[in-house]
From Swiss-Prot:
Protein name: ATP-dependent 6-phosphofructokinase
Binding sites annotated in the UniProt record for Mg(2+): D104
Annotated residues for binding of ATP: G12, R73, F74, G103, D104, G105, S106
Highest taxon listed in the record's lineage: Bacteria
Length: 320
């Protein structure tokens, strides 16, 4: 029987993580459970930095970006001896289960703890929207609004100077954030990690647009596809049009979460408590067709693939 649980946030922060923590804490307390907040992710778990949370611990956090528990990269967690210390710390504190909020790397940590006999539930918290088993991740919609605002502002200055603007968007190997922002922002060109990219082909498309009378353009590109500064130099050289690259960077992770992220995080947090009380461990929570779902965390990490929104890209191309 579950009586006391821990909750931590891990990996890159995402707007809505605080709402998720609040959902976990409030739902657990309603069911008569005790909750301990673990500071700075798996590193804090290893260092035994945790404290009991009550209803007031999560008051006035639903609107705050980031995570008040903190987060940290902790590669040492791959070491089984380090993980054993974490398990011993949780057992000494009387914890029966752990809720982990983060991306696929955080899920891997939860998987390893589950394999050591400690039940964990994973909640998808990342702006990249790259976690399998869920339509959307906590933080994605807030980041989308942040990127869209930046694109709108870039369009203002690009049109004034008849300039080509490249905007680099986060996402790692997933282009969901770039694609959605590009459609909403009316970007003329989209470069995604899921689609083979050729700078030469992009230049041809830009030149075709110029021949049709296009006086400015915005190229939305996901990070890590290429060096955007070098791409800007190449485009300017080949087209004769002033071209500038803007890397949005970590600004995409910040800010007060939008309504949908707050609702999603609250639902997922509460649902994690339902699963634990039903005896589940080694599961990850998702939302599919607006319904809460859960999957085996090993399956989500190793076997499930996020579907590429090819139909969205087809739509975007029709609108250029």
């Amino acid at each position: 029987m579950i009586r006391r649980i821990g909750v931590l946030t891990s990996g890159g922060d995402a707007p809505g993580m605080n709402a998720a923590i609040r959902g976990v804490v409030r739902a657990a307390l309603t069911e008569g459970l005790e909750v301990y907040g673990i500071y700075d992710g798996y590193q804090g778990l290893y260092e035994d930095r945790m404290e009991q949370l009550d209803r007031y611990s999560v008051s006035d956090v639903i609107n705050r970006g980031g995570t008040f528990l903190g987060s940290a990269r902790f590669p040492q967690f791959r070491d089984e001896a380090v993980r054993q210390v974490c398990v011993e710390n949780m057992k000494r504190r009387g914890l029966d289960a752990l809720v982990v909020i983060g991306g696929d790397g955080s899920y891997m940590g939860a998987k390893r703890l589950t394999e050591m006999g400690f039940p964990c539930i994973g909640l998808p918290g990342t702006i990249d929207n790259d976690v399998a088993g869920t339509d959307y991740t906590i933080g994605y919609f807030t980041a989308l609004e942040t990127v869209l605002e930046a694109i709108d502002r870039l369009r203002d200055t690009s049109s004034s100077h008849q300039r080509i603007s490249i905007v680099e968007v986060m996402g790692r190997h997933c282009g969901d954030l770039t694609l959605a922002a590009a459609i909403a922002g009316g970007c003329e060109f989209i470069v995604l990690p899921e689609v083979p990219f050729s700078p030469e082909d992009l230049v041809c498309e830009i030149k075709a647009g110029i021949e049709k009378g296009k006086k400015h353009a915005i190229v939305a590109i996901t990070e890590l596809v290429c060096d955007v500064d070098e791409l800007a130099k190449y485009i300017e050289k080949e087209t004769g049009r002033e071209t500038r690259a803007t890397v949005l960077g970590h600004i995409q992770r910040g800010g007060s979460p939008v309504a949908y992220d707050r609702i999603l995080a609250s639902r997922m947090g509460a649902y994690s408590i339902e699963l634990l009380q039903q005896g589940y461990g080694g599961r990850c929570v998702g939302i599919q067709n607006e319904k809460m779902v859960h999957h085996d965390i090993v399956d989500a990490i190793e076997n499930m693939k996020r579907p590429f929104k090819g139909d969205w890209l087809d739509t975007a191309k029709k609108l250029f």
